[in-house]
Amino acid sequence: MKVAVIGCGTIANAQHIPAYCNNKKTEIKYFCDIIRERAEKAVETYGCGTAVTDYREVLADDEITAVSVCTPNKAHSEIAIAALKAGKNVLCEKPAARLYSEALEMQKAQHETGKVLNIGVVNRFNICVNKIKELIEEGALGNVYQVYVSFRSHRSIPGIGGDFTTKAVAGGGVMIDWGVHFFDIVMYCCGDPSTKTVSAEKFSYLGNPIEDYVYTSMWAGPPKKDGICDVEDGITGMIRTDGPVITFNGAWAQNIGENEMFIDFIGTKGGIRLQYGADFTLYSTKNGMLTKTEFDMEKPQMFQTEIDSFVDCIESGKKLPSHIDTNIITAKMMDAIYRSADEHKEIIL
């Protein structure tokens, strides 16, 4: 199966390209990036493919079966929709798009073409996450009535001044970058409950002005001190669903002592704390005593599993849990979070 990677930045080089190279069924024919040097570097590094700068050239090639869209968020919907209409199967990095309306257009194109459109919500391929989903479905926690989500860092604004902190490119800040992963886990494990109301507030203090931002290291750096930082570096709020009430606190940068990256699933019979990217602990009772069970599970290569599953579903026609139809539920909720924060009022859905 011949594939192409559109967008040859950090996530493509760290995950998508190596995963395709490790999959015996796939051959990368094109590396595409508007910055030619990036595409050429990929050809040189991986010893395969052709470097191009226009994704339309990729889509015009009938030999291409599938593409990974790893561009900045602003290009996701345009490229994914064009690829679907050109008869290609698509794995689009998260978030699906900058805006809920764009994600809906992507879903519409998928329904019209019948091609695969999966979103890069990679935690749905995490063994720990799937075990939590299983435990909740089995009733181990009883009624899960509350979920608390924390994705807070002391100093982690990525590439400040660049694409990540430019609203016109990214669509938002920490919520659309980190929050999308955490909320996707919550929705997936809790059976995709419908959102009823959302109340949120967002903050942008530590990244403005850019020249005053103090840090020790920076992912996706170096900083562009003459660039733009017009997105939130912090956000908090509450969501009512027809399942649990979800409260959350997220920040790229916050004056706290330690990073806090976890999700608490709180039920009537038990509770689970998932440390993001690590293991989880189940708190319950048995024989009149409080219990604490630590689950230490195999750490899978989630991106490899994601790519392998994408390739397999193209061949089998099986619908994956990362399909656009499931992701659109989270996209709608996140849209309401931003609307609430922008308008300083509760949003009723």
Q: Where are the regions a protein language model picked out?
A:
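N-terminal Rossmann-like dinucleotide-binding module
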Residues: 1-46
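Active-site loop of classical SDR/Rossmann-like NAD(P)-dependent oxidoreductases
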Residues: 11, 274, 296-308
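Predominantly a Rossmann-like dinucleotide-binding segment in NAD(P)-dependent oxidoreductases
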Residues: 11, 123-226, 344
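Hydrophobic residues in well-ordered beta-strands that form the structural core
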Residues: 12, 92, 117-119, 248, ...
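Conserved SAM-binding strand-loop segment of SAM-dependent methyltransferases
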Residues: 48-55
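Beta-strand-loop-alpha-helix segment that lines the small-molecule cofactor/substrate pocket
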Residues: 65-66, 72-73, 77-124, 139
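C-terminal helix-rich "cap/oligomerization" subdomain common to oxidoreductases
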Residues: 66-69, 112-115, 287, 295, ...
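Contiguous beta-strand/loop segments that form the cofactor/metal-binding neighborhood of enzyme cores
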Residues: 184-279, 307-318
